[in-house]
A protein has these predicted regions:
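Surface-exposed extracellular loop regions of Gram-negative outer-membrane beta-barrel proteins
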Residues: 122-144, 245-270, 346, 351-358, ...
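Sequence/structural signature of outer-membrane beta-barrel proteins
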Residues: 89-91, 134, 148-152, 177-179, ...
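N-terminal periplasmic/intermembrane-space "pro-region" immediately following the signal or transit peptide
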Residues: 2, 6-7, 15, 21-92
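Outer-membrane beta-barrel "beta-signal"
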Residues: 387-389, 412-425
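Outer membrane beta-barrel
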Residues: 71-100, 109-224, 238, 243, ...
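Detector for outer-membrane/organellar transmembrane beta-barrel domains
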Residues: 249-369, 375
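Surface-exposed loop/turn segments flanking beta-strands in extracellular/periplasmic regions
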Residues: 100-109, 319-326
Length: 425
């Protein structure tokens, strides 16, 4: 693993005065003429900018179609597209259950004789609709829909469905606590384990205060992952979470720094006292990206809080917002910290590389009731090369490393080498 990282690091330091790129981590989206107008006319760059702003901002969550219908007098832009992602991978070390998501917290011990596995996947392929009405007006209206094949038995599952009007975003998409544009680019569908990435029903208002300063505040649908015991039980949630952020951007938007926060109270039933109780949760995040020089840019985020496990990649499916304690009927929040840092280098307009490291730690209360296999901390390392043949076809290769340790001190390691072919239209 060290040799792999050193090789990529050395490559990234070469030619800083060469190709000058924006902070875009995915060179498949770099060209200004990536969207071809149909049944109407408008500058391709304008269509790209409008549809790109209407789509999710996470770098591996494509929502930019290659063709768009242009309404009369440019009253609307409508793009309907799809992306096929064919992936082949080889896993070695301990067992990584999913062929789609490389998640350190899900690593399980390898069975005797199962030291390696060759696997294939296509389920992260997607189709999407990106629509913006009155794109050159302050009253522009946007609708975005995206679905993948990640449901049970490869059924279609909606990953985003939301509308926009002026500064309002409402629907099923990322929480405002997620800084998608600050996440490093990965071929792995999951991405860095310590980053905030939560999709749910949300509504938030984003506002530009000046040319450089902006902010947002909203509400997220109330959810709670509570590890109850015999004296507690989950109840329906009543109070939505409140995410907000303040951001400063420069360099034409290629660099920014964002301070985010979230407040999320969660209710449960105290069976000992026959009444409902509340766990108070909340967290802060510092995130951003910066164009350093030439084709080199960096991304980072640092998150800390109580009862925010649902919002962190590695904790989102393991029920660790709050845990039962030795006091009957009493639950306490789990404290969590996530850290991510990544570098991107664009060698040419067609070839780019990304390397990253991410870490997540959970601190359980001293009187927590938890099994020895409860997730304590994990690490995630990824390095990739992505080559774009044209705006429709690209390919990439990536190495992923994951490490996890439970509260009993037992550790597991998993490795993956994967190649991806992407066809987008």
């Amino acid at each position: 693993m060290k040799n792999t990282l050193l090789a990529f690091s050395a490559a990234l330091t070469v030619g800083l005065t060469g190709f000058t790129a924006s902070a875009q981590r995915d060179n498949r989206l770099e060209s200004d003429d990536i969207v071809t107008p149909l049944l109407g006319s408008a500058p391709s760059k304008d269509i790209k900018n409008v549809l790109e702003q209407n789509a999710p901002q996470t770098p591996n969550d494509n929502g930019l179609p290659r063709f768009a219908l242009v309404g009369k007098e440019r009253q609307f832009y409508l793009g309907i597209g799809a992306q096929f992602l064919g992936e082949a991978m080889f896993d070695f070390g301990d067992n990584m259950p999913s062929a789609l998501d490389f998640t350190p917290s899900s690593i399980t011990p390898k069975a005797p004789g199962n030291g390696g596995a060759t696997r294939f996947a296509w389920q992260s392929s997607s189709f999407y609709m990106n629509f913006v009405a009155m794109p050159n007006s302050d009253n522009h209206i946007g609708v975005f829909l995206k679905a993948k094949f990640t449901g049970a038995n490869n059924n279609i599952k909606v990953s985003h469905f939301y509308g926009k009007f002026r500064g309002l975003t409402m629907g099923y998409t990322h929480s405002a606590f997620t800084d998608g544009s600050a996440m490093p680019m990965t071929i792995d569908s999951e991405g860095p384990n310590g980053s905030v990435s939560k999709t749910l029903f949300t509504a938030y208002w984003a506002q530009d205060f000046t040319k450089n300063f902006s902010g947002a505040i909203g509400i997220d649908a109330p959810i709670a992952d509570l590890a109850t015991a015999d004296s507690e039980e989950s109840v329906t949630q009543r109070i939505p979470a409140i995410p907000l952020y303040l951001q400063y951007a420069w360099d034409g938007g290629d660099s920014h720094i964002r301070l985010s926060g979230i407040y999320r109270p969660m209710q449960y039933r105290n069976l000992t006292e026959a009444k409902n109780s509340t766990v108070q949760g909340g967290g802060i995040q510092l995130s951003g990206m910066v164009h350093i020089a030439g084709g080199l840019s960096a991304q980072y985020d640092a998150t800390y809080g109580s009862a925010i496990g649902t919002y962190l990649q590695d904790d989102s499916d393991i029920v660790i917002d709050a845990v039962a304690t030795t006091e009957p009927g009493k639950m306490k929040a789990v404290k969590s910290m996530g850290l991510t840092a990544g570098l991107n280098y664009a060698f040419t307009p067609k070839l780019s590389s990304n390397i990253m490291y991410s870490h997540l730690t959970n601190w359980l209360p001293s009187d927590a009731v938890a099994g020895p296999d409860t997730y304590r901390y994990g690490d995630y390392v990824a390095a990739n090369l992505i080559y774009s043949f044209n705006k429709f076809l690209s390919a990439g290769i990536e190495y992923d490393y994951g490490h996890m340790k439970n509260i009993a001190g037992e550790g597991l390691h998993a490795n993956r080498i994967q190649a991806q072919l992407a066809v987008t239209f």
